[in-house]
A protein has these predicted regions:
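Long, contiguous interaction/recruitment modules in multidomain scaffold/adaptor proteins
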Residues: 169, 173-272, 353-433, 490-491, ...
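Extracellular and analogous surface-interaction loops
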Residues: 582-594, 635-641
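A short beta-strand element within beta-rich, extracytoplasmic domains
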Residues: 590-605, 609
Length: 692
């Protein structure tokens, strides 16, 4: 085994260790405290995030510009061209499908860098922002070449590494459209000081709010460092730098998955009061009493200190409903997206990171394209949502065209000393073909469902897919339903082969999609598909796990766990409930009597209270449960069970809990991964069985 292959094997095994044990990363960081910057020979074998690992540990000190590569493309000594390297084959799917970057010709050359938004995620590889920008500039300026170096999953250190190579391309300008992946590691990091300070704050009143402030200050420093590095390697080399400040889906995206709450640990009475205030506000919002909802939810926010995405999101919706307070609604919804949570890593630019890009970029001489301002001005809507975004941060075709138009308007005077009206540049921006737009919405529907978004938003994207391209409604929608409804891994189902024959679908489903069907619950995805296309309801959404054909169903199996379930992040012998209701969907072959067995507890409850079960909205039993594990069994008559989809709900009591912050602090200071959200119940066992 040669040296590079050996290193690759070690890197792969080390990556597996990091995935299995978060403390291994902290150990690595401790060992790297005195690390020196690696030279080109030392880092040549790394790829993607690993390519930046030495730079990360060394904090970008003394990194020399690479002499023989631009991202995944390496110089061909015979021709001088940059050729896609075989050793980076694992990254090809994240980059432009370009085999060779030739020598610069007579046209002006722009290097286009960024993350998945800059790649045109959901449209990739058929419709790319770099292609749109090239056509716009060529139409109203002179013929140009835009070299697409954008890479999905690109971290800030790898971005700086690629930017440092742009002088090799003789670029006339560099555009960096990034910021959504600029984030920190786990809570403490590597140094002892954060363990002491953060540990004290975990136990303090409103300590989590102060921890969040500390994390945001660290993000400020990170963003300033990255922007400074980008300016050093571009402006420092005499190349104009354009920084595109990203925007996110403020109106429609929710960071806290539907049906859950992210309540930080509070005192016993405060947790109870928080839940009461939240429930009151939710009911007021449902009846469109927006001012009342605002008043109620502010009580909850006063208790959590602004560290709950759920409470901030509800406040933002209440402000939005009042109509006259859109600026307040924007700031509040934006704040809800910026709550840092290790178990909910949503690619999106933090508001303070965007501010730092603007400020430091301008100070260093970069030209700023401010997409939040552009989107608000061009759409007349201060709350960008599904019109411009397909998920948390990736754009619709309109969003792409507006972003590249603003970028082109900035580049024209830099490259050609001329200006052009925004509308003229927008008119020159090509649109995707209707089939491409349909596929983008179809994949977005899958993605939103997997990320715990509300059913209405997922159904919206599926309907948009069918309207954009009716042939998708005829074939691809059914293929998605068939691929994801069975026990078999989707990639082994014939329908999946048909889906991935489309290049857009292949890029997402094979490159990014979750392929293991049995690993998590697909009921929300299948329900959203059926809502958009009711004819699908004729087919069972769970043919391999049907009660009646199987004698027993274990509802705590991964098959009934959402992809974004926080429980997946922790090694424990129970499933925690993060809301006062836990819902489970199952399919029954026919109405017949069944038995429900469960073992549960209300952790740290001061006293026992009523746990109630409902099946399809009908009460089927209740019992008192406290802090001790309690085993229960309920017999359900046949008339309560329906043929097809059934909904089991368990409602947990809102009782006072002992304050667990002192224990969390001890666990944290001992190096354990701690769960900083309130558990309303623990489930150790939950099965359904047909009556004997």
């Amino acid at each position: 085994m040669d040296r590079n292959r050996l290193r690759h094997e070690v890197a792969q095994r080390f990556a597996d260790v990091l995935k299995q044990d978060s403390r291994a990363l902290s150990l690595l960081q401790l060992l790297a405290d005195d690390a020196h910057a690696a030279g080109p020979a030392d880092r040549a074998h790394w790829s993607g995030p690993f390519a930046a690992l030495a730079e990360d540990a060394a904090h970008l000190r003394g990194i020399d510009a690479p002499q023989d590569s631009v991202g995944i493309w390496e110089r061909d000594a015979a021709t001088g061209d940059f050729v896609r390297a075989q050793r980076h084959v694992d990254l090809w799917r994240f980059c432009a499908n370009v085999e060779r970057i030739g020598k610069k010709g007579t046209r002006k050359r722009i290097a286009w860098l960024g993350e998945s938004v800059a790649r045109g995620f959901f449209f990739d590889p058929a419709y790319a922002p770099a292609q749109v920008l090239e056509q716009q500039l060529s139409a109203l300026g002179e013929p140009v070449e835009v070299v697409d170096l954008a890479q999905s999953n690109c971290d800030p250190w790898w971005l700086a590494h690629v930017a440092a190579s742009t002088p090799l391309l003789e670029a006339d300008a560099v555009v960096v459209f990034a910021g959504n992946n600029w984030r920190l590691g786990e809570l403490a990091g590597s140094a002892p000081e954060p363990y002491v300070v953060d540990g004290e704050l975990i136990e303090a009143e409103h300590g989590f709010a102060r921890i969040l402030e500390r994390q945001h200050r660290k993000l400020d420093a990170l963003a300033a460092q990255v922007v400074g590095r980008l300016a050093d390697v571009t402006i420092g080399a005499g190349i104009p730098l354009v920084l595109v400040v990203p925007e996110i889906n403020v109106a429609d995206w929710i960071n806290c998955p539907a049906g859950t709450l992210d309540v930080p640990p509070l005192s016993a009475g405060d947790t109870q009061r928080w839940v009461d205030a939240y429930d009151d506000a939710r009911r007021a919002l449902d009846r469109q009493a927006y001012a009342d909802a605002e008043e109620r939810i502010r009580l909850a926010i006063a208790l959590d200190g602004g560290t709950s995405s759920a409470s901030l999101d509800l406040l933002g919706r209440a402000l939005r409903g009042q109509g006259r307070r859109m600026d307040d609604a924007y700031r509040t919804l934006r704040q809800s997206r910026d709550v840092i949570d290790d178990t909910r890593i949503v690619p999106s630019v933090f508001a303070n990171v965007a501010d730092t890009i603007r400020r430091v970029g301008a100070e260093r001489g970069a030209h700023i394209v401010d997409l939040p301002r552009v989107f608000a001005e061009r759409t007349g809507d201060p709350l960008p949502g599904r019109r411009l975004f397909l998920d948390y941060c990736h754009h619709t075709a309109e969003g792409i065209r507006l972003a590249t138009t603003a970028t082109a308007q900035t580049l024209l005077p830099l490259l050609f000393e001329r200006d052009a009206p925004f509308d003229a540049l927008l008119a020159a921006a090509p649109s995707p073909e209707r089939e491409q737009e349909g596929w983008a919405h179809l994949l977005a529907g899958i993605h939103n469902a997997h990320w715990g978004q509300e059913a209405e938003l997922c159904s919206h994207h599926f309907r948009e897919a069918g309207q954009a391209a009716p042939e998708i409604a005829d074939d691809a929608i059914r293929q998605v339903y068939d691929a994801y409804r069975g026990r078999t891994t989707p990639s082994l189902v014939p329908a999946f082969d048909k889906l991935s024959a489309n290049p857009i679908a292949e890029t997402y489903l094979v490159g990014f999609g979750v392929l293991s069907r049995n690993a998590f619950r697909e009921a929300p995805l299948l329900a959203a598909l059926t809502d958009a296309f009711p004819a699908l309801g004729e087919h069972s959404p769970d043919p391999d796990y049907t009660l009646g054909e199987l004698a027993t169903l274990d509802l705590l199996d991964a098959h009934w766990s959402d992809l974004k379930d926080r429980n997946r992040w922790y090694r424990r012998a129970y499933r925690a409930a993060y809301a006062l209701a836990s819902s489970f969907t199952f399919v029954a072959a026919a109405p017949r009597a069944l038995s429900i067995a469960l073992t549960c507890r209300i952790p740290d409850a001061r006293h026992a209270d009523r746990v109630a079960l409902e099946l399809n909205g009908q009460a089927i039993g209740a019992a008192d449960v406290g802090s001790a594990w309690t085993s229960l069994r309920f017999e359900v008559p046949a008339h309560a069970v329906v043929h097809g989809i059934n909904q089991l709900s368990i409602r947990w009591p809102n009782v006072p809990h002992d304050d667990r912050r002192a224990q969390l602090r001890r666990d944290f200071e001992a190096g354990a991964r701690i769960d900083i959200r309130t558990h309303f119940a623990h489930l150790h066992h939950l099965t359904l069985s047909t009556a004997a």
